[in-house]
């Protein structure tokens, strides 16, 4: 079957924003205007189509990035139908992993900002992730109808807070309750949407006289930005010639695709104004799969030979699984993005990361939580497969005859853990199954059993992250669980280099003995790098080469539980440079034990320290409560990084140890009568002060 829409008319876009910038409402309006949704779902009523988990509807925040397919031909029906896949991404900082995961499979993004709140903390995180994956983007300044809305202030913040190069594509006519429409700075016309049909139809009008001067100034800015796309256009512009509408659009598109500029649109999704023109901008300025760099990978040939897959149906099939979701009706749904080739339902594909074959039974295209079964998918498509058995997020699915492993996704280590136990013994098995399922869906969530206490431990990116997972266990799997006190994921490392540390394991009393002897140097590595490095510098065969991996293994086992307080050891380099062996008594086990003895000894001598996770916290508070908020943050060992005035008060940026932040949400609410809000994300590991380290080590020793 031939593809219905040529790949040049595909747009794979993400919609990304801070909480409450109105992203879900914006997505709802997109679905409405593209003809998928006949009644607009309001988040206020918990009825939005995109928020498809019960919890999201209760909390009014988006947790799962659902992928939706729709078609758009322009608000004046000026284009051929374009196939738009929308990935809805969460705006809460505990779900950064979801954002990262969806950024990986997008070609372009729409960043939604609140016209009142502007560029908020989470916006910066999302921006950094979009930079990391080189995602071209446009901005939509939403909520122009709200008190305190100011379009040009947000444009300024895009520059000052994100270091972006914003170019307004539109201006807002009026603001707050006087917001009536927008000015299209390319056409130099005002656009007025018809309220009677919820903004489906519109009229072009002349620009209001009181805005003519401002519009001319910003039109000039837009044309200048377009002219910078090429020397040829610049010469034409400087020569006083008018650039045509087509030339302006083509030039702006080139610059957006290179991420040199971010075009800024505006509107009010709630009032049905502006989303239609923003959709047109998606078509005109964001990339098709063929406009972005081809995806790189490695061949599964044992040599890791680099390979490329282009967005082309003729190339061998390759796809990336970017999300696993459990659906109450069909079981496992594996969302995947097809990078090259074609695959049909019923085909067998290879999961090249796990070297396992999987049969693609049914393929569905999702509209939030409704699904349509399709027979085949092509390069550029985003779809979900039902019933794949052993696929996890980040795995590659490909043609078994042309195996390739696409770039893997990297997932952060969890920073917080809690013990969980089922309320009834009968639920033990059910809880194990539920946690296994949830861990498969979310790579930033880990589950293990504590060997000493026998407790089940779950770990994640923040308190809210774990709350929601425990809540999902209750709702989706009917497992009620008791949750212990949150524990911080400390780490251990060393600060000094030590040389010639010996490790000897010798038992030679009659019969076959054991003998292993190693000499190592240990030194600290820079933080945030590989974490552990083992260098073999044995010359002259003082240790036979078949025993070298055993030494490494012995050390790696010690890394899991450090000598200070049993926390994982990071940022250590070990050089194995001398040792001795016995022809008969030496074995792998003996050298493994010798390696671990040397490591323990060296660690004690190398000035060991405890590292604690430091969080980047931003608090937005009305000015009246500023003193209380600052005093409280100081008590929590916070280091103030900066302060800014906002439309509603002050924003404070602070670095605070995670161990001091438990229960902060409740404390902040009571200090500010619920008027302040905060966001928190992991920043780095730093050395814990000696009094804190001492208390932690003593508590672990009990």
Curated annotation (Swiss-Prot):
Gene3D superfamilies associated with the record: 3.30.230.10, 3.30.70.240, Elongation Factor G (Translational Gtpase), domain 3, P-loop containing nucleotide triphosphate hydrolases, Translation factors
One Pfam family from the record: GTP_EFTU
InterPro entries noted in UniProt: EFG_II, EFG_III, EFG_III/V, EFG_IV, EFG_V, EFG_V-like, EFTu-like_2, G_TR_CS
GO CC field: cytosol
GO biological process: ribosome disassembly
Intracellular or extracellular location(s): Cytoplasm
Binding annotation for GTP: 17-24, 88-92, 142-145
Family matches, as NCBIfam families: EF-G (TIGR00484), PRK12740.1-5 (NF009381), small_GTP (TIGR00231)
Designated name of the protein: Elongation factor G
Lineage: Bacteria, Pseudomonadati, Pseudomonadota, Gammaproteobacteria, Enterobacterales
């Amino acid at each position: 079957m031939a593809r219905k829409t040529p790949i040049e008319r595909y747009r794979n876009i993400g919609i990304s924003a801070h909480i409450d910038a109105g992203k879900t409402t914006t997505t709802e309006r997109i679905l409405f205007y593209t003809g998928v949704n006949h009644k607009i779902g309001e988040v206020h009523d918990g009825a939005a189509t995109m928020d498809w988990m019960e919890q999201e509807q209760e909390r009014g925040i988006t947790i799962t990035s659902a992928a939706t397919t729709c078609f758009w031909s322009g608000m004046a029906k000026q284009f051929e139908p374009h196939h738009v896949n929308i990935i809805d991404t969460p705006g809460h900082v505990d779900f950064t992993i979801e954002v990262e995961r969806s950024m990986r499979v997008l070609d372009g993004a729409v960043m939604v900002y609140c016209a009142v709140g502007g560029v908020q903390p989470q916006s910066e995180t999302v921006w950094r992730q979009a930079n990391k994956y080189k995602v071209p983007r446009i901005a939509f300044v939403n909520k122009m109808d709200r008190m305190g809305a100011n379009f040009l202030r947000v444009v300024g913040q895009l520059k000052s807070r994100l270091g972006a190069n914003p170019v307004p594509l539109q201006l807002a006519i009026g603001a707050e309750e006087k917001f009536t429409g927008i000015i299209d700075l390319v056409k130099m016309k005002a656009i007025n949407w018809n309220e009677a049909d919820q903004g489906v139809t519109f009229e072009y009008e002349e620009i209001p006289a009181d805005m003519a001067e401002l519009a001319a100034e910003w039109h000039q800015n837009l044309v200048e930005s377009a002219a910078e796309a090429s020397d040829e256009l610049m010469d034409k512009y400087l020569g006083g010639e008018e650039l045509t509408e087509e030339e302006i659009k083509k030039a702006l598109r080139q610059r957006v695709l290179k991420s040199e500029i971010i075009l800024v649109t505006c509107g009010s999704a709630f009032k049905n104004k502006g989303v239609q023109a923003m959709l047109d901008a998606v078509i005109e300025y964001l990339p098709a799969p063929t406009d972005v760099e081809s995806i790189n990978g490695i061949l599964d040939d044992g040599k890791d030979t680099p390979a490329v897959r282009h967005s082309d149906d003729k190339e061998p099939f390759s796809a990336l699984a970017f999300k696993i979701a459990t659906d109450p009706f069909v079981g496992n749904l594996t969302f995947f993005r097809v990078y090259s080739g074609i695959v049909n339902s019923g085909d067998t594909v290879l999961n090249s990361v796990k070297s396992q074959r999987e049969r693609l039974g049914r393929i569905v295209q999702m509209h939030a939580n409704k699904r349509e079964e399709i027979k085949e998918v092509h390069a550029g498509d985003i779809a979900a497969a039902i019933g794949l058995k052993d696929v996890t997020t980040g795995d590659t699915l490909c043609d078994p005859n042309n195996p390739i492993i696409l770039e893997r996704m990297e997932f952060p280590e969890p920073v917080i853990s809690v013990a969980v136990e089922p309320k009834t013994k009968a639920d033990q098995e059910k809880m194990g199954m539920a946690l296994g399922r949830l861990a498969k869906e979310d790579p930033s969530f880990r589950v293990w059993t504590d060997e000493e206490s026998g407790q089940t431990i779950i770990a994640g990116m923040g308190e809210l992250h774990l709350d929601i997972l425990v809540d999902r266990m209750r709702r989706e799997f009917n497992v009620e669980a008791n949750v212990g006190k949150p524990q911080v994921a400390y780490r251990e490392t060393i600060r000094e280099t030590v040389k010639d540390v010996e490790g000897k394991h010798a038992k030679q009393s009659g019969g076959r003995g054991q003998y292993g002897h190693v000499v190592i140097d240990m030194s600290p590595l820079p933080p945030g790098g590989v974490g552990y490095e083992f260098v073999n510098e044995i010359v002259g065969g003082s240790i036979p080469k078949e025993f070298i991996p055993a030494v490494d293994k012995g050390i790696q086992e010690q890394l899991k539980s450090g000598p200070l307080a049993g926390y994982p050891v990071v940022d250590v380099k070990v050089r194995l440079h001398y040792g001795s062996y016995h022809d008969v008594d030496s074995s792998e086990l003996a050298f493994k034990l010798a390696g671990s003895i040397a490591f323990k000894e060296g660690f004690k001598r190398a000035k060991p320290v405890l590292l604690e996770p430091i969080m980047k916290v931003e608090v937005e508070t009305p000015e009246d409560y500023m003193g209380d908020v600052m005093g409280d943050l100081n008590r929590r060992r916070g280091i103030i990084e900066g302060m800014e005035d906002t439309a509603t008060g002050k924003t404070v940026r602070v670095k605070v140890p995670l161990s001091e932040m438990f229960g902060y949400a409740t404390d902040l609410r009571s200090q500010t009568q619920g008027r302040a809000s905060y966001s928190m994300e992991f920043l780095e590991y730093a050395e814990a002060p000696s009094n804190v380290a001492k208390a932690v080590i003593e508590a672990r020793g009990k």
